[in-house]
Amino acid sequence: MEIFTHLLLLSVLYMECLVGFTVNMIFLAAIFMKWKTQRSLPTCDKILSQLAISRGLYFFSVIMGNLIFHFFPWLLQNYIVLSIQYIQAMFMILISHWIAAILCVYYCVRIVTYNCALWVFLRSRISTLVPWLVAASVIVSLLSSLPLGWFGYDCKSQNISNYSAGSITGNGFVIVPNMDIWFLILILGSFPPFVIFCAANSLLIYFLLVHTKRMRNVTSQNLTSHFGALKSMSLFLVLQIMFYIFTSLSASGKFLRIKFVIPIYWIILCFFPLFHSFYLFFSSSDLRKILISKCLSFINCT
């Protein structure tokens, strides 16, 4: 019964990751088709493409990590493979936080209007700053993840071999993750982008709420667009907060000895980016129209 439950949870996790990877690759393909048609992309779509890439790689890394852990555990006896696995797992989480923060800052700067000189300067420069911000986020995420390659695990005797997150080496030791280091690196690496994201998103939601109240007597089309933006950013804020909470809980290692906790944690952690990826794709009518038209033209040609 335990084996059946474990396999069922793994099947749900792999299916969830495959769907998430596919949705983000379709989203990325739609953006590419838009660029191919128009020969240019607005900055917002460029950031969304980076978000789709980071989430696609996140789902792919979850699949590969769980495949290695459950079906090829002997690979984790190699310290190089283990270090690479730990580094890329942390990198995917941190870069997702940073890209989400950059997207929210861009929306906030472009939509919120203030007469402050710094704000006016940011509005005029934000499009040119975005590529540098993305590059900096990649570097910061990588540098923040590298310590896991050296300090992210401990070697202990086989008397704790029942530890669900460990792997036994050929020397009779069990390699277990050092959850104190995991938690410390995750908090130090993800807290700055999370604070930036929450601050920018909260400011944007407040501005949209105030602006929507002032537009009660304006045309319904403008009011509908503001309601849509308000709903989208509120959903993004809730999902990102939940993602941050559950990644922090998983990195704390408090529940690793509970049966089936690892696949359950990954199922929960993958749900938030999966749900938001679906929402982004189906709420973007332009990208859906471009993708549908390209698919129809391809079908007609064949």
Where does each model-flagged region fall?
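Extracellular N-terminal segment of 7TM GPCRs
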Residues: 1-22, 186
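Structural signature of the GPCR N-terminal helical module
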Residues: 12-75, 100-109, 231, 238-239
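Seventh transmembrane helix
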Residues: 99, 235-241, 245-249, 261-302
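Fourth transmembrane helix
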Residues: 99, 125-158
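Class A (rhodopsin-like) GPCR signature focused on the TM5-ICL3 interface and adjacent 7TM helical core
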Residues: 101-102, 187-217, 234
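Extracellular-loop-to-transmembrane junctions of the mid-late helices
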Residues: 144-150, 169-200
